[in-house]
Amino acid sequence: MAPKKPDPKKDEAKAGAKAAAAPAPAPAPPPAPEPSKEPEFDPSKIKIEFTPEQIEEFKEAFTLFDRTPKCEMKITYGQCGDVLRALGQNPTQAEVLRVLGKPKQEELNSKMMDFDTFLPMLQHISKNKDTGTYEDFVEGLRVFDKEGNGTVMGAELRHVLATLGEKLTEDEVEKLMAGQEDSNGCINYEAFVKHIMAG
């Protein structure tokens, strides 16, 4: 039997079939989005708007946290959040770490700050306090509206106010809810939020 002659047309078709069978190279993945960069906290850009009387009051509270042997008017970075909260602020731990410049865990108990370093942090936290809107509060109370009729049970609201989040005392709850319940013990929560926000 004579050897087969190469057939250029068949060879071309085979090569084309092999090329078609090979998977196309995967497209390059899109570049990862850059994390949104929050501007670094710069205490030198903070304008102090407290009155001299307020500053004296803050300084007094600050000294109560001073644990240095010679009362040097300094606190550790780790105490900063406690002092802010003692002064009526309610920052998250993430906010505290941000104004501190995101220190390492071991620096929290070793690095110290004086009152002049602390004051711009207090000013920044107090200015940026996230106060909820009317809609936020209504949405939060809607969770307890089991009937979907715009009311919540007064007893349930009392329980929530006294046991969750920043707990209120019984007296505070009673003052807040005075005259808000209807004859069935229910509270129209939209009217309740308006009442609270009006002060």
Curated annotation (Swiss-Prot):
Entry-annotated residues carrying N,N,N-trimethylalanine: 2
Coiled-coil residue windows: none
Residues annotated with Phosphothreonine modification: 92, 131, 133
Post-translational modification: N-terminus is methylated by METTL11A/NTM1.
Residue numbers carrying Phosphotyrosine: 134
Location of region: Disordered: 1-44
Subunit text: Myosin is a hexamer of 2 heavy chains and 4 light chains.
This protein's record includes keyword Oxidoreductase: no
PANTHER family: MYOSIN LIGHT CHAIN 1, 3 (PTHR23048), MYOSIN LIGHT CHAIN 3 (PTHR23048:SF2)
Positions bearing Phosphoserine: 183
Species for this entry: Bos taurus
Lineage summary: Eukaryota, Metazoa, Chordata, Craniata, Vertebrata
Intrachain S-S bonds: none
Name listed for the protein in its UniProt record: Myosin light chain 3
Biased composition (Basic and acidic residues): 1-15, 35-44
